Every structure is written in C-alpha cells, then in structure tokens.
Regions:
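Hydrophobic alpha-helical transmembrane segments of multi-pass integral membrane proteins
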Residues: 1-6, 21, 74-80, 100-104, ...
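Hydrophobic transmembrane alpha-helices of multi-pass small-molecule transport proteins
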Residues: 2, 61, 70-91, 109-110, ...
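Loop-to-transmembrane alpha-helix entry segments
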Residues: 13-18, 48-51, 67-87, 95-102
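Hydrophobic/small/kink-forming positions within alpha-helical transmembrane segments
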Residues: 23-32, 55-60, 86, 109-113, ...
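Specific alpha-helical transmembrane segments that line the substrate/conduction pathway
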Residues: 26, 35-69, 108, 194-200
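Helix-helix packing/entry segments at the starts of transmembrane helices
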Residues: 31, 47-53, 118-139, 174-200
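Hydrophobic alpha-helical transmembrane segments in multi-pass integral membrane proteins
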Residues: 32-39, 86-94, 98, 138-155
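Hydrophobic/aromatic residues within transmembrane alpha-helices
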Residues: 37, 64-66, 70, 122, ...
C-alpha cells in the first residue's frame, strides 16, 4: 500500500494522531487479528463471516460516542443479521471453530468498527490519502508481529519461497482490496451515518 503511493500522494490535512488511529485500527488491528486467527486454525470462510460482526460493534460505538440514533429498523436488521450469522456459522462449521480463533476474529471486527468511527471523526478528507498515509503507522507493528510469529529466518523463508500466485495475492490485497476497497468505504463512512453504511 505504501510504495509508491506515499511518494506520490500528499498527506491529508489531519493531525498525525488521527492517521495513527486510523492505521492501527482499520488496518493493523483488523488484519493483524484476522491473520493471527487464521494461523491458529480458524476456517477462512467462518472468519470472513464472523468479521461482519463489525456492523454490530459499529452501530453500538456510534450510538455511544457519536450519539447517532439507532432506529427500530436498524435494530431489526441487526437482530436478523445476527441470527443469520449464528445459523450459518453453527450449521457449516460446527466443531471446527477454535475459541482463540473466534476471539481473535471478534477483535478484528471490533478494530474495524473503531476504524469506522475514526474515519467519521476525521471527516471529509481525500480517502485515498487517508488510506495511504494511515498505513505508514502499520509497517513497524506488522513487522514486529511477523517476527514474533515466525522469526526473522521464517519471514525470510516465506518471502523467498513465495510463488507468483502468492505475490499476485499480495498485490491484490494491497492495491485492489485495500486501496480501492477502503478508499470507497472511507468515502461513504465520512459522508453518511456509520450505522447506515456499516451493514453494506
């Protein structure tokens, strides 16, 4: 995400602590917890499903901190979605969900929700510059987590043994899923009530 974008895109006119808050919640927190959950045996399909709990966390935090009203139709939609997530998760993955993995995915969802609130508090800025410069604060934490999990030799081995498919996946995550996806997402969240956007 950082290179070469950080060299080409101007830093958004917000304080550094807001950029740090954005990077450490919606980027490092969300994906750090998610990838750690996968490493302890959490099924990928179930992780992708349960991380949508960010909707519930976002609506709750927005009501508490931003004083956004929670309308009855929002509550009904949340209840229906929660029941649906529960039924799908229990039905398809019964017995295949490690407790540690579950807690880590929920932490990822909570981090995503916090990131949504940060975007809302920052207000209307160029979402592309926010994504790029916010990720300046993720480089060191991600590096430390990788070294903690795999060690320097393990990290180097994984990099050196990656196939072209692996590198294609990295590029897709960095420049399509993150830049394109989160630029669009951030633009919506900054302009609308987060309780309206988060279920999307």
């Amino acid at each position: 995400v950082l290179l070469p974008a950080v060299l080409l895109i101007r830093r958004p006119p917000v304080r550094w602590y807001w950029l740090a808050a954005y990077g450490t919640t919606i980027s490092f927190g969300q994906f750090g917890f998610m990838f750690t959950a996968l490493s302890v045996g959490m099924p990928t399909g179930l992780a992708a499903l349960l991380v949508q709990a960010q909707v519930f966390f976002t609506v709750l935090i927005a009501a508490l901190l931003l004083h956004e009203p929670v309308k009855p139709n929002h509550l009904l939609a949340i209840v229906v979605a929660a029941v649906g997530l529960l039924l799908i998760g229990v039905g398809q993955y019964s017995g295949a969900m490690p407790l540690a993995g579950l807690m880590l995915v929920l932490c990822a969802a909570f981090s995503w929700a916090l990131g949504n609130i940060v975007v809302k508090r920052i207000g209307r800025v160029n979402p592309l510059s926010l994504v790029v410069w916010g990720n300046v604060f993720t480089l060191i934490p991600f590096t430390l987590v990788a070294l903690w999990q795999f060690g320097a030799e393990g990290v180097w081995q994984q990099i050196s043994l990656m196939s072209w498919r692996g590198w294609a996946g990295v590029l897709f995550l960095a420049y399509v899923a993150t830049l394109v996806g989160y630029v669009g997402w951030g633009g919506l969240v900054s302009r609308q009530a987060v309780s309206k956007i988060s279920p999307l």
